[in-house]
UniProtKB/Swiss-Prot annotation:
This is Biotin synthase. Keywords: 2Fe-2S, 4Fe-4S, Biotin biosynthesis, Iron, Iron-sulfur, Metal-binding, S-adenosyl-L-methionine, Transferase. Its cofactor is [4Fe-4S] cluster; [2Fe-2S] cluster. GO terms for biological process: biotin biosynthetic process. The gene is bioB. It comes from Buchnera aphidicola subsp. Schizaphis graminum (strain Sg). Belongs to the radical SAM superfamily. Biotin synthase family.
Amino acid sequence: MKRKWNLEDTKKLFSKPFFDLIFEAQKKHREYFNPNRIQISTLLSIKTGACPEDCKYCPQSSRYKTGLKKEPLLEIEQILKAAKKAKSSGSTRFCMGAAWKNPKEKDMPYLEKIVKEVKKMGMETCMTLGTLNNSQAKKLAKAGLDFYNHNLDTSSNFYSSIITTRTYEERLSTLKKVRNSGMKICSGGIIGLGEKKQDRMELLMELSNLSIQPESVPINMLVKIPGTPMEKNENVDPFEFIRVIAATRIMMPKSYIRLSAGRENMSDETQAMCFMAGANSIFYGCKLLTSSNPKEEKDQKLFEKLDLFPDYKIQSITEENKNNENLKISDVNKAQYYNAAI
């Protein structure tokens, strides 16, 4: 029976001595996952910029002058080419994001076709397109979409300080529609928005107390983009970030926890502690829109130091991969990539 987390218990969890918390998280992690495996995702912006929303952290909002060049929907051939390269680099999941408040009905045939074509490659698929209605969720599920990303971002109490163009209830409603359609949920949040510790606790409570916990939980460290209202936010204490990762693992033991945006600003040691605390998924080998992800060579070296290997359980391992389990680097057009997690 799934545990229901309340604020008192969550506060006790967060207040544990740091090493006790990490130790508990690592034990919980080993109950459900191989600690030496990591799930690799690649993400692509299929429509960039000119978003009508006012999310204060996001460079894609049309309300802020971030210098981001807007781009129309990509051709399907461009998307499939990127997906093929992603698979060759070791990714098992291909994520696609569009800077919309919600998809229009005229876009649905295009989106459904993309899902079907990427699925033919043997990859898991994920999309983040904004809010969905029931019909759209069912169409995407029927097309074969495995995951739908729709983050809660922060606590319900702090949410209105970050976004006013979409309510918290709308986000929860979309997650419910996604779940009812049969798709899996990818939903997490951002640390560093100016929230208090209790907001972090309440975010994790909201996610963990969903009827079925998200299969994928991206935890982002705010990337401060010039031109957004949050460009001068205070830096996140790495130990506090690691504490959030550990609490996420304990509260959602069966979920993949993705160390998402902000890795470029993390030391190898911080990332290693995040993996120790239960993170077991990353976005790899791609640029996160206007912010950069660690260079492929740097990630490669870190994984080798930590003896981390990609999780190939979604796709069969080719003979080439059997001979060399280390991640392979592909020559990807980085300008097209976008942080689907935020």
